[in-house]
Amino acid sequence: SKGTLLNQADFILTLMSVFWDEGRSNLELFCRETRNPDTKDSSPFNYFIEPDPDQLLRASIAYGFKRARLQNVYNVLRGKDLDTGEFSDRRRNKQFKILQKAQEEVLDIQNWHEFFKVLVSAGFRRGDVISSETGLIYTYAMYLIGKNDYKVDPFELRKTMARWFFMSALTARYSSSAETQMEQDLNNLRSVKTGDDFLSLL
């Protein structure tokens, strides 16, 4: 249920408070600033989405861990070995470094605003015509994967992600069982080796 999903996100946010409080604070500040029009060039304010911390956390997890199911990521962030069930501080620290690097990209102002050009290319001008914020968040994660992991040409990436987002919105791809659908989409990336492969998959 949706309540369960929110609780899982809350568990991870609580872990962040304990082991990486600066990361949670940065996440919450970014979300607040999306709601405040600002004259600064570096403001995350936009006309598409006013995200909550749990939404951008999902983007970081999808991008960094290539996972959508938060329960599994919660366990690895606690330092749990999913095969043996054992916990270790070293494993936890390693996983938090992955989350830290992912969140840096998700909260990067240039990435954030470049992504909105994808939505404009898809024919969207504002958030009230977008039916699924989850779809937007997951598309942002896929955009970052294409940009950073596969070094896709910026023009080709924008064009392909615009088509991906438009079709996702049209088919309500992430409107129900969003975690399951995104988990499948991320699993499909396992066979992708090049930027061309990434574009072909989408």
Predicted regions and their residues:
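A cross-family structural signal marking well-folded subdomains
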Residues: 2-12, 19-202
